[in-house]
């Protein structure tokens, strides 16, 4: 049932040409398999990713983008290609600026470099 609803959401994302934001718990392998089967044109973004670098690598190889929040794995944050990275405050009471600062430090970026990269990445949502 959940997979059927997910596939319906994928169809909507494709029809309306919108990225798909995905909260995935204990189903990364199946999600990766579905992406291969469906071969979507629109970006798929894993929201609130807390996984290990190996999982991040699997997702990136399969074509996903990854969004990090307050509770991120530092090694994973370093391993995600800059053009596949998003940052969020969904799960946090911290200001987004604090989350940016923590992720920039983990990646060895300045806050300005990270903010500019995320702004470029946001273009998958349309013009900004």
Describe the predicted segments one by one.
Residues 74-82:
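Short amphipathic alpha-helices and their capping/turn segments at secondary-structure boundaries
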Residues 83-95:
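Short acidic/histidine-rich active-site segments
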Residues 11-15, 100-128:
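Mid-to-C-terminal alpha-helical segments outside catalytic/metal-binding sites
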Residues 41-43, 83-84, 112-113:
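Short acidic capping loops at alpha-helix termini that bridge into adjacent secondary structure
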Residues 31-33, 56, 77, 95-101:
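Histidine/acidic-residue-rich catalytic or RNA/ligand-binding cores of hydrolases
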Residues 24, 48, 64, 70-72, ...:
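Active-site metal-binding loops of divalent metal-dependent hydrolases
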Residues 1-62, 109:
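Divalent metal-binding pocket/active-site signature
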């Amino acid at each position: 049932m959940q997979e059927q609803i997910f596939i319906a959401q994928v169809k909507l994302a494709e029809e309306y040409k919108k990225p798909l934001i995905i909260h995935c718990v204990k189903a990364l392998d199946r999600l990766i398999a579905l992406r291969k089967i469906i071969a979507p044109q629109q970006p798929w973004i894993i929201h609130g990713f807390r996984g290990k670098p190996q999982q991040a690598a699997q997702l990136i190889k399969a074509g996903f983008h990854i969004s990090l929040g307050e509770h991120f794995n530092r090694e994973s944050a370093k391993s995600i290609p800059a053009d596949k990275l998003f940052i969020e405050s969904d799960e946090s009471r911290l200001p987004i600026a604090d989350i940016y600062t923590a992720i920039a430090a983990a990646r060895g970026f300045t806050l300005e470099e990270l903010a500019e990269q995320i702004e470029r990445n946001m273009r998958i949502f349309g013009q900004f």
